[in-house]
Amino acid sequence: MVEKIIHFSDLHIKLYKDHKQYKDILCRCFKEWSDLEPDRIVFTGDLVHSKNQMTPELINMVTWVLSQCSKICPTIILIGNHDFLENNLDRVDALSPIINTMGNPDIMYFKNSGVEEDENINWIVYSLMDHNKRPDFTPDPAKINIGLFHGPIQGLVTDMGFAFEDGYNTNEFRGCDLVLAGDIHKHQVLGIPNNKKAYMVGSLIQQNFGENVRKHGYGVYNIKNDEYKFIEVDNRSPYLNFKIKDITDIENGKEKLTNF
């Protein structure tokens, strides 16, 4: 029976840059996750950054991440918009060849929309391969119906203050007991029908200067208590934005950090 879920998203692994920094952070996460003894790890999209551009370094990094997760517990991967070419579905996505070659039964790649049965859970998969069309499903009252989603949702905002007024309609999540989501890199919680919640976990690691240093990490969902806890991850090499009037602010130590 699945009782505890680790939720993370939006790694955006680059072709060859920043892999050492990512490994340092991920190794600490893997240790924490192993200690938490989860039953499932769920990644909600954008494992890679450059869509279908690949390098040997990227393949090695993706394989390592998936292998380490699967050693902790069975791991579920959702496709993100950076993992394939949305405007050309005839092209193979970046993750399928890697996951297929690995042949690891503890890595479950939910690429297409639908309902995936998994012990006491029905995973309700909203897939970008089908333009996030609502899956045809009837909620099973005997199971926990968990939506998996990657994309902007109405009511979300970015660290820069942009609001997604035309994002995905939360009514499309009706029937879900909760939704685990990725895509927007700022951690947020949204209400969905029937007084349930959608958790946009945010990116595990700060991606650029347009994002705040803090509030990047992963979520832990306890099914028994219906409790979702966000855990912030320490980044020892952050992108820092400073505001100064002139060079004397730096000389006098009066520069102001604006994206903490």
Predicted regions: what they are:
Residues D83-N171, V201:
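Conserved catalytic scaffold of divalent metal-dependent phosphoesterases
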Residues E3-I5, D39-R40, I121-N122, I144-I146, ...:
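Structural motif
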Residues D10, G45-D46, G80-N81, H150, ...:
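Active-site glycine-centered loops adjacent to acidic/histidine catalytic or metal-binding residues
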Residues D159-N225:
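Conserved beta-sheet core of the metallophosphoesterase superfamily
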Residues V2, L11, L15-V115, E172, ...:
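Core catalytic region of metal-dependent phosphoesterases/phosphodiesterases
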Residues T75, N145, Y228:
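Hydrophobic anchor at the start of a short beta-strand
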Residues E116, A198-F260:
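Binuclear metal-dependent phosphoesterase catalytic core
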Residues I6, N122-I124, G219, P238:
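Conserved beta-strand elements of the Class I
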